[in-house]
Regions:
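Ligand-binding loop in jelly-roll beta-barrel domains
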Residues: 92-115, 208-230
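Conserved hydrophobic/aromatic beta-strand scaffold that supports enzyme active sites
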Residues: 43-45, 62, 87-89, 158-160, ...
């Protein structure tokens, strides 16, 4: 993907990425590179409209809805309806769908034996204390943080996280993290490349090799997906 102005290397703003498809079948194929990818996951933005049946996904996936409405049904007749800011997990399988200008980000997980249920994630699930940043990196007083994990199997996990304001020095990322901000804003920066700010509603991916400091000036909440190489 072409680098956008003022975006750090290996930091991708998925909300401004070109749409990879207007129907779910095309989007699944594009995101998973037709099932031939050796990458741990695929990702992309799609703007879906219309409906379809018999759509196969070879991989488990996470769908995050930025705008519009999306209804998905599995072969057992279970149904999910997503609206703005909602997230669903899907196992590999066959699906029917109906969408109205559904602007979404899809992540497919190229990992065998991963147990993923079909359902909408409860992003308001109670959180427990945890997920604090490394104290040695802080440039402000330590924040108060909390988290909840929906999936914690190595090498991929996802959940929700909240923090009070804090800032830290740049780190070089050795893992991938996709973030969907639900509240607040954050600025990622480094001295050589500048800075980029993301706000509530943005979905972005930080890939291995990115160098970024973190600064959230107000309370922040996010949905996150992390892949840590073995």
């Amino acid at each position: 993907m072409q680098r956008e102005p003022n975006v750090l290397r290996n930091v991708i703003n998925l909300g401004v990425a070109p749409s990879c498809g207007s129907d779910l079948e095309t989007a699944f194929r594009a995101v998973s590179l037709d099932g031939q990818s050796t990458e741990p996951f695929g990702f992309g933005r799609a703007i879906l409209s219309g409906q379809g049946t018999g759509v196969e996904s070879l991989f488990s996936s996470i769908i995050m809805l930025r705008d519009g409405a999306l209804n998905i049904r599995d072969n057992n007749g279970l149904e999910i309806t997503l609206t703005q800011g909602e997230v669903a997990s899907l196992p590999a399988g066959i699906f029917s769908w109906e969408a109205r200008a559904a602007d979404c980000v899809i992540l497919t997980i190229h990992q065998e034996r991963l147990s993923v249920s079909f359902g909408k994630l409860d992003l308001d699930h109670p959180m427990s204390p945890g997920g604090a940043p490394n104290p040695a990196l802080l440039t402000t007083p330590a924040p108060t943080t909390s988290r909840h994990e929906f999936q914690s199997d190595d090498p991929i996990a996802w959940g929700i996280w909240a923090t009070t304001p804090y800032a830290r020095h740049p780190i070089t990322y050795s893992f991938s993290e996709l973030m969907m901000l639900r509240r607040g804003e954050v600025t990622l920066s480094n001295p050589d490349e500048g800075s980029v700010t993301f706000v509530a509603g943005d979905i972005f991916l930080v890939r291995p090799g990115a160098v970024a400091a973190w600064d959230n000036p107000s309370d922040l909440e996010k949905f996150w997906i992390i892949h840590s190489p073995s």
